[in-house]
């Protein structure tokens, strides 16, 4: 009991440390290493529990008993003479039987874990796209996929349980057979006068004790295979490329002025063949306000992600205050850039939680100031819980325009010197957008602003305009001159 308790305590401590380290690696991983399916990735993390179960299993204590089996064999040889050959022969036969079952079980468990990841991915995708399924009338199609996946998984689990049961019962049979053989052989030795009854009883008890650990180890076979595969996936998670490299010593820049230079950068998303950006060059002085327009898929949002250091350019440089972006600590960088993405979800929690995300220390006065500026204060006034109003998972309890207002308020909360706004009003109505634009006009003065938009009215916030098309800058200059060139067809297409 004490041994099992100590193992369980050690396993719990190991679990806490490993799970914390694992989550740290996940949140710190490079966006290039982000998995294609969230569900399968989540299942891999969930399977980590199987590793802890294996390490804390009571049957794992049987491994400690194995060395004592050799000592018991010596004792049987001393008191029972030739009877020692029965457990000596049964021991390797039992081990060989368990090993053969383990080989058959390995492939089954591996396929089972893969199907489990597919099922988890299917479930998460279904829950996230439930409205889409209902709108398209595709519930039955998804139901069929679920039944097929779950049915295959059930069959594999049943086969794995059968093999595990075969290993356990087969080992038990060999134990009992060895015990019977010991008694039968011992009787003949007693008749011949070469063994006493007491020695036979002792040999029988010691022989059973020798084979007992093998019976317990047979019960570990299934857990071992799951733990082995889980360890492989855990190793892959721990090896994920990180944003912060241990050998790097980033520069500490707690206050940036906002001068920005993009030098001939090119970028291709992982797993894609076509480049998203090709030979992009732009230069902004501190406090300059640039609007970026272009058709969907032209690379505007990709450029914003590179500026936030979510990804690194394959070629070229991005300089901020004459320093390469890769020399700056990503936390310091993002702390000084107000970023809004058109498809960025909110997190489950309250309005206050999302407004002050990453800046819980901010004062209520500052929070109210940006809430007034962006119109978020109206969301609090309209609800009896005020700023404790729940927003739901991914902000589903708010409209698209309301979510964008919250995101914009959060971007302005720390009064950053640089703003990167990617379609900040795409889901807002005209009235809300006009009111927000009027309030922002004074606030953005003196700040470096990069505004990506399809709304012509929002361009009143910028003095300069660049046009992206198919990953290239096809126009860059004063706003009025670029708009005039677009009207006359002297530059590539843009979406406004």
For each predicted feature, which ranges?
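Cytosolic ends of transmembrane helices, especially the final helix of ABC transmembrane type-1 domains
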Residues: 8, 115, 135-138, 162, ...
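Transmembrane-helix motif of ABC transporter permease domains
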Residues: 1-15, 86, 96-97, 197-198, ...
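Loop segments that connect adjacent transmembrane helices in multi-pass transporters
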Residues: 20, 24-25, 29-39, 111-160, ...
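Juxtamembrane loop-to-helix connectors within ABC transporter transmembrane domains
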Residues: 7, 27-71, 128
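Transmembrane helices of ABC transporter permease
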Residues: 1, 61-111, 184-195, 212
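ABC-type nucleotide-binding domain
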Residues: 253-496
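Hydrophobic alpha-helical segments in the permease module
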Residues: 1, 91-93, 164-175, 184, ...
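Pre-NBD coupling/linker segments of ABC/ABC-like ATPases
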Residues: 243-255
């Amino acid at each position: 009991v004490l041994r099992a308790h100590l193992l369980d305590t050690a396993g719990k401590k190991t679990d806490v440390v490993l799970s914390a380290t694992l989550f740290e690696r996940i949140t710190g991983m490079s966006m290039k290493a982000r998995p294609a399916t969230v569900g399968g990735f989540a299942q891999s993390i969930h399977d980590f529990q199987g590793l802890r179960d294996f390490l804390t299993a009571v049957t794992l204590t049987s491994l400690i008993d194995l060395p004592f089996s050799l000592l018991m064999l010596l004792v049987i040889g001393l008191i029972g003479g030739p009877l020692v050959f029965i457990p000596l022969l049964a021991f390797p036969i039992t081990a060989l039987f368990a090993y053969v079952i383990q080989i058959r079980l390995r492939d089954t468990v591996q396929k089972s874990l893969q199907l489990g990841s597919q099922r988890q991915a299917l479930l998460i995708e279904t829950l996230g796209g439930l409205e889409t399924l209902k709108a398209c009338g595709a519930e039955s199609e998804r139901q069929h996929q679920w039944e097929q996946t779950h049915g295959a998984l059930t069959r594999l689990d049943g086969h794995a349980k059968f093999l595990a049961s075969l290993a356990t019962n087969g080992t038990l049979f060999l134990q009992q057979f060895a015990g019977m053989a010991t008694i039968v052989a011992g009787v003949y030795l007693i008749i011949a006068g070469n063994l006493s009854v007491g020695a036979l009883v002792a040999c029988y008890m010691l022989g059973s004790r020798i084979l007992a650990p093998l019976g317990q180890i047979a019960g570990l076979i299934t857990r071992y295979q799951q733990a082995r595969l889980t360890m492989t996936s855990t190793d892959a998670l721990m090896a994920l490329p990180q944003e912060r490299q241990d050998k790097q010593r980033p520069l500490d820049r707690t206050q940036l002025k906002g001068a920005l230079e993009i030098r001939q950068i090119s970028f291709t998303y992982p797993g894609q063949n076509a480049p998203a950006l090709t030979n992009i060059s732009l230069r902004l002085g501190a406090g300059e306000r640039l609007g970026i327009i272009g058709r969907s898929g032209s690379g505007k949002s990709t450029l914003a992600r590179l500026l936030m250091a979510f990804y690194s350019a394959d070629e070229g440089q991005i300089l901020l205050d004459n320093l390469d972006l890769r020399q700056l600590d990503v936390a310091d960088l993002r702390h000084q850039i107000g970023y809004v993405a058109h498809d960025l979800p909110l997190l489950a929690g309250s309005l206050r939680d999302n407004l002050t995300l990453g800046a819980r220390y901010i004062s209520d006065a500052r929070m109210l100031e940006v809430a007034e500026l962006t119109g978020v204060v109206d969301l609090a006034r309209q609800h009896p819980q005020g700023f404790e109003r729940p927003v739901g998972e991914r902000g589903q309890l708010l409209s698209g325009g309301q979510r964008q207002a919250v995101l914009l308020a959060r971007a302005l909360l720390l009064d950053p010197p640089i703003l990167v706004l990617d379609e900040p009003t795409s889901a807002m109505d005209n009235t809300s957008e006009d009111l927000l634009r009027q309030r922002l006009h004074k606030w953005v003065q003196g700040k470096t602003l990069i505004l990506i938009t399809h709304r012509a009215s929002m361009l009143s916030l910028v003095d300069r305009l660049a046009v992206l098309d198919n990953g290239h800058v096809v126009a860059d200059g004063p706003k009025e001159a670029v708009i005039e060139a677009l009207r006359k067809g002297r530059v590539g297409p843009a979406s406004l």
